[in-house]
């Protein structure tokens, strides 16, 4: 209604503008026209900034058939050894072996060992460092040390300090002492009673060859030495004497 009144007022109003034929007359603005129809859609705009990742979706259905097994991996480091298991039951008794005299391989081995042993004894005997009496062998390395050191040397070699238990053994040891021209300790030691001597294993002495008047150390000389003539004398154990071992 307001627009209609305004239009009538403009129509009834006298024209105040005059213009010549040569001039362009400019009138008052007209009534606004009706809106036009929509234009064509515009072009797509530029991509926007990348958004944050969305939440994980639900688990999908299982896939197809399982694939083939992969190749074996490298062998790992050895594990810690386990605890020792219980001892097993004894096995069945085996068949009896051949008698030694029928075992050709054993006989050949024994023959070879015997041959090498005889060779060694022969060589050392020529050097004057070994004497064999019965089942015993007496040997020296030519060194002179105290009694305890001799025991250790002989033990390391698998023997013990030489000690005669018969006249024949005494003569064998005496021959080494004479050749080396050095007294030697024997495998004897004085017991609790002065003048009573025993073998080192504790057994009483069953053979002696004391020098006249010996022993006379009265408990102060606990060891026994052999002279170059084979006679015995009690002596303190700290002197240096020839190493002679028996095997």
Curated annotation (Swiss-Prot):
SMART domains: CLECT. Residues 1-15 form the signal peptide. The modification 4-hydroxyproline is found at residues 29, 32, 35, 41, 53, 56, 62, 66, 69. One of its GO terms (biological process) is respiratory gaseous exchange by respiratory system. Disulfide bonds join 154-245, 223-237. Glycans are attached at residue 206. PROSITE patterns: C_TYPE_LECTIN_1 (PS00615), C_TYPE_LECTIN_2 (PS50041). It is found in: Secreted; Secreted, Extracellular space, Extracellular matrix; Secreted, Extracellular space, Surface film. GO terms for cellular component: collagen trimer; extracellular space; multivesicular body. It holds the Pfam family Lectin_C. Ca(2+) binds at residues 214, 216, 233-234. Residues 132-247 form the C-type lectin domain. Residues 27-99 form the Collagen-like domain. Residues 41-50, 83-92 have a biased composition (Basic and acidic residues). Pulmonary surfactant consists of 90% lipid and 10% protein. There are 4 surfactant-associated proteins: 2 collagenous, carbohydrate-binding glycoproteins (SP-A and SP-D) and 2 small hydrophobic proteins (SP-B and SP-C). Oligomeric complex of 6 set of homotrimers. This is Pulmonary surfactant-associated protein A. It comes from Oryctolagus cuniculus. The lineage of its organism: Eukaryota, Metazoa, Chordata, Craniata, Vertebrata. The gene is SFTPA1.
């Amino acid at each position: 209604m307001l627009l209609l009144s305004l239009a009538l007022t403009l129509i009834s109003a006298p024209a105040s503008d005059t213009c010549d034929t040569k001039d362009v007359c400019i009138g008052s603005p007209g009534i606004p026209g009706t809106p036009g129809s929509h234009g064509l859609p515009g072009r797509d705009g530029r991509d926007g900034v990348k958004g944050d990742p969305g939440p994980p979706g639900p688990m999908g259905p299982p896939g197809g058939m399982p694939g083939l097994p992969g190749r074996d991996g490298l062998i790992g480091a050895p594990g810690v050894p386990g605890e020792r298991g219980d001892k097993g039951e004894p096995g069945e008794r085996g068949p009896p072996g051949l008698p030694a005299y029928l075992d050709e391989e054993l006989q050949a081995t024994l023959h070879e060992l015997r041959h090498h042993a005889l060779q060694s004894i022969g060589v050392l005997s020529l050097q004057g460092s070994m004497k064999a009496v019965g089942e015993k062998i007496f040997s020296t390395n030519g060194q002179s040390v105290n009694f305890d050191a001799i025991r250790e040397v002989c033990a390391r070699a698998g023997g013990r300090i030489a000690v005669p238990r018969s006249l024949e053994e005494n003569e064998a040891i005496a021959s080494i002492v004479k050749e080396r021209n050095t007294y030697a300790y024997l495998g004897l030691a004085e017991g609790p009673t002065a003048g009573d001597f025993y073998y080192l294993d504790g057994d009483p002495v069953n053979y002696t060859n004391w020098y006249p008047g010996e022993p006379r150390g009265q408990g102060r000389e606990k060891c026994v030495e052999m002279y170059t003539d084979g006679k015995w004398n009690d002596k303190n154990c700290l002197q240096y004497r020839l190493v002679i071992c028996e095997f």
